[in-house]
């Protein structure tokens, strides 16, 4: 454990003890949306309404008043206000979201580790994690395995969202805001009764920004620009004396940029030529100059129906959800330095690509790009032509990089039936069943850039304007069957026991959609995994597998006093295994294991992930709830943790999921809040997570390293004001400061590794030993950073609100994500948001 972590953990324990007696400290949960006795926050964390203080688990709650005060709209807003939770979203594309809770991360291209439940319905597509979900009323973030209660992919926790329901009278809200970088937001809702027993809510939102960054070559704001709009409808009706129908529909459309990354090198033996060949990722100056305009499109369609019927002693709930999310991205290629399109082969396409590559290089010789890369007189890699050659890096302004097109389209249908007790007895129970069908197509296509744009077809034959050179394209089908049950027993007035369990069966299959074709640039098959028999390319065979797991959970709660509870829980988390794009293992083996002897273990199928998690904690309050606190400690062992790997080489790029055999996680967490006077609240929280890779057959040298994407600690402090300054005017203000500790993003950390340059140098014009091309990844840890957000304004007559806001007020420079491409010899870096000032106006009616 680091010295800082030990100090913070010790301080947390001391603060927890102090909170029980001091009026200055308490838990950071925000204001109440639904209040019980003595202002208790009411939550549905266990699919039943109960006081937050009674829930035997760590739960962070954002109620309606807190959501408005903090300007929370999406997951990236509330994740930054939650201890032990970090998020990476929108770096590659809008639907690319990874949420990490206490060291368990949702690996890119695998399933999420966090369940998303909106108005009682489980959403299964990871692309929906950071979407707006309508008019928010309350958000609960549960930590630890929640699969027994909330369903699949809840190994790290669950996000439970409640949106606006129609009431007995007409109401609504309109909000507009304007900020720097041509950033505009508009959203609102209207809720109205329909007859005596029904009601309707319609919500809409719009967002536009030019983004923070600029493409110098294209002379346009096409790096992180985005335009999004959505409309949500909800119809709730009593269709019988004890029966309620809840219908929802949603449509959303996004257009923007993709692949907000720069490349950085970590080759220490080249630092004598240029120090930037061995660059600390935290010191990288971001600049953009690709010749291909990056594009990201996302379209979402959803329909759901939920029926709830109350019997005399039990409630039956049944729902169904149809979801269709299509995603596409277009961007520049990554591999000009490996000369895939540089030298002509015996095909017209290869000649055309080579001519374009040489011509654009000659035209752009000397054009300034990020050091240590440069555009020389020719596109020949400088290690083969030290006098006139080039070092492009990724996303250069020449056509030598090629192009990339990626799609991720998913349609799914899910349904659940749940029967739960509905009495005041000491024994409560629920039982149910769940079904899910997923049809998902993913594709990654690398094509030649002939200066004529990028095709939206994954496969473009030889002779086309954007001929395909490498293709991974698969259809994934999944059927999920699950049964679950739970029992909650109030043993006496102070002691309760809960037991829950869920059994999942996931049938998965994959079929390759890659045609049997040769690559016009390398002469091999369009997918290196395709066999060639008697000169004829063969299709990749179908694969299938079934994954099964029982997920038990046990929780204990003891009421020490009327104001203090202690609890403990243990549970098993589960994420199904699955398939990478077929041919991935062959690409890695041919380009890395056989060429430079890395012995990286990548399979076309990745294993299921399971975790065993234990948590114990204490929750308390004082002064009629004005002071609240909770302190928790946890330990988790993860077997076969799923981890995203990114490979770059002469083949282009490759995205795969691998497994880390065993990871140990443990830590502590503290939340404190105090209402100093009526209308003035202060709050704070801290999390420390220690992690260690215990076994990793995929990369054995990484044993002893930390869990990737896991911050060493997070600290949140803030204050909120709502004070009268006149008969009908209130002064409102909120400040939130979040510190995120050092973070590794890969299993390879303080480790050297051979790269493709190690294999190329001995045969190059430089004739250097292979070891000169080895990389050192000790410079890839993201540093600690802190972000301050401030909102100040007036509320008039409880209806009209004017707020000035600043995001990242101190203009802190930080990294959103680091993706080391180990055998490439560098990393792909995505920047965090810069400072932005704006004004927001809202009207309630």
For every predicted segment, state its role.
Residues 32, 493-494, 628-638, 656-748:
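Gram-negative outer-membrane beta-barrel transporters
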Residues 738-757, 793-845:
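C-terminal beta-signal and adjacent terminal beta-strands/loops
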Residues 212-222, 259-291, 334-405, 445-473, ...:
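Solvent-exposed loop segments that connect transmembrane elements
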Residues 96, 112-113, 125, 134-137, ...:
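Outer-membrane beta-barrel translocator/receptor signature
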Residues 236-240, 419-422, 428, 432-436, ...:
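Structural signature of Gram-negative outer-membrane beta-barrels, strongest in the C-terminal barrel
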Residues 1-70, 76-82, 241, 303, ...:
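N-terminal Sec signal peptide and the immediately downstream disordered periplasmic leader
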Residues 44, 76, 80-121:
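Extracytoplasmic beta-strand/coil segments of soluble accessory domains associated
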Residues 304-333, 559, 565-571, 582-583, ...:
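Membrane-embedded beta-barrel scaffold of Gram-negative outer-membrane proteins
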């Amino acid at each position: 454990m680091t010295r800082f972590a030990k100090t913070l953990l010790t301080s947390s324990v001391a603060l927890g003890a102090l909170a029980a007696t001091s009026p200055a400290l308490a838990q950071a949960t925000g204001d109440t949306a639904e209040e019980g006795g003595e202002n208790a926050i009411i939550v549905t964390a266990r699919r039943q309404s109960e006081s937050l203080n009674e829930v035997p688990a760590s739960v962070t709650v954002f109620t309606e008043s807190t959501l408005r005060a903090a300007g929370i709209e999406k997951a990236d807003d509330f994740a930054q206000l939650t201890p032990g939770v970090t998020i990476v979203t929108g770096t590659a594309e809008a639907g690319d979201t990874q949420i990490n809770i206490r060291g368990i991360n949702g690996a890119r291209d695998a399933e999420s580790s966090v369940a998303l439940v909106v108005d009682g319905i489980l959403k299964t597509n990871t692309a929906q994690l950071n979407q707006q979900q309508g008019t928010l009323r309350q958000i609960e973030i549960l930590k630890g395995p929640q699969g027994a209660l909330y369903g699949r992919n809840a190994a790290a926790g669950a996000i439970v969202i409640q949106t606006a329901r129609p009431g007995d009278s007409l109401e609504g809200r309109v909000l507009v805001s304007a900020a720097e970088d041509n950033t505009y937001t508009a959203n609102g809702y209207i809720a109205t009764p329909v007859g005596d027993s029904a009601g309707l809510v319609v919500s809409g939102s719009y967002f536009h920004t030019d983004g923070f960054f600029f493409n110098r070559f294209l002379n346009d704001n096409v790096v992180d620009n985005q335009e999004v709009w959505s409309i949500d409808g909800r119809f709730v009706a009593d269709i019988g004396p004890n029966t309620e129908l809840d219908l929802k529909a949603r449509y959303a459309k996004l257009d923007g940029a993709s692949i907000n990354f720069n490349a950085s090198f970590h080759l220490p033996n080249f630092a004598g030529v240029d120090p930037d060949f061995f660059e600390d990722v935290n010191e990288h100056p971001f600049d953009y100059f690709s010749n291909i305009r990056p594009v990201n499109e996302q379209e979402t369609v959803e329909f759901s129906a939920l029926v709830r019927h109350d019997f005399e002693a039990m409630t039956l709930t049944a729902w169904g959800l149809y979801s269709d999310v299509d995603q596409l991205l277009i961007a520049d290629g990554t591999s000009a330095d490996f000369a895939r399109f540089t030298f002509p082969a015996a095909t017209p396409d290869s000649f055309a690509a080579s001519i374009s590559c040489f011509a654009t290089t000659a035209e752009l010789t000397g054009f300034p790009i990020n050091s240590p890369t440069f555009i020389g007189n020719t596109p020949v890699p400088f290690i083969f032509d030290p006098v006139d050659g080039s070092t492009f890096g990724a996303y250069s302004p020449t056509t030598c990089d090629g192009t990339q097109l990626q799609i991720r389209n998913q349609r799914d249908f899910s349904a659940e039936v749940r029967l739960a007790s509905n009495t005041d007895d000491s024994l409560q129970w629920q039982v149910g069943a769940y079904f899910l069908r997923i049809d998902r197509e993913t594709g990654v296509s690398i094509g030649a850039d002939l200066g004529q744009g990028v095709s939206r077809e994954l496969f473009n034959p030889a002779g086309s304007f954007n001929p395909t050179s490498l293709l991974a394209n698969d259809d994934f089908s999944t059927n999920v069957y699950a049964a679950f049950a739970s029992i909650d027993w109030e043993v006496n007035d102070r002691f309760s026991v809960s037991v829950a369990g869920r059994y999942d069966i996931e049938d998965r299959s994959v079929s390759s959609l890659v045609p049997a074709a040769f690559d016009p640039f390398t002469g091999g098959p369009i997918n290196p995994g395709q066999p060639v028999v008697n000169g004829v390319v063969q299709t990749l065979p179908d694969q299938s597998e079934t994954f099964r797991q029982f997920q038990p959970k046990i929780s204990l709660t003891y009421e020490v006093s009327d104001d203090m509870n202690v609890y403990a829980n243990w549970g098993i988390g589960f994420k199904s295994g699955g398939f990478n794009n077929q041919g991935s293992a062959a690409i890695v083996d041919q380009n890395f294991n056989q060429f430079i002897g890395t012995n990286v273990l990548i399979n076309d199928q990745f294993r299921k992930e399971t975790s065993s998690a234990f948590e114990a904690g204490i929750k308390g309050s004082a002064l009629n709830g004005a002071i609240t606190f909770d302190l928790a400690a946890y330990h988790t062992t993860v077997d076969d943790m799923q981890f995203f790997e990114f490979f770059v080489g002469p083949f282009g790029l490759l995205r795969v999921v691998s497994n880390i055999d065993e990871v140990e996680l443990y830590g502590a967490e503290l939340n404190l809040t105090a209402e100093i006077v009526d209308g003035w609240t202060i709050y704070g929280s801290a999390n420390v997570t220690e992690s260690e890779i215990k076994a990793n057959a995929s990369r054995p040298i990484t044993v002893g390293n930390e869990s990737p994407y896991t911050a060493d600690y997070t600290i949140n402090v803030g204050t909120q004001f709502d004070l009268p300054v006149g008969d009908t005017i209130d002064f409102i203000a909120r400040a939130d400061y979040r510190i995120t500790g050092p973070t590794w993003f890969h299993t390879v950390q303080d480790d050297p590794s051979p790269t493709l340059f190690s294999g190329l140098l001995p045969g190059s014009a430089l004739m250097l030993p292979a070891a000169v091309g080895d990389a050192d990844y000790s410079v890839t840890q993201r540093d600690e950073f802190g972000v301050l957000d401030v909102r100040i304004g007036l509320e008039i007559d409880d209806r009209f609100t004017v707020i000035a806001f600043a995001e990242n007020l101190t203009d802190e420079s930080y990294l959103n994500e680091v993706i080391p491409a180990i055998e490439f010899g560098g990393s792909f870096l995505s920047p965090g948001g810069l400072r932005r000032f704006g004004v927001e106006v809202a009207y309630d009616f």
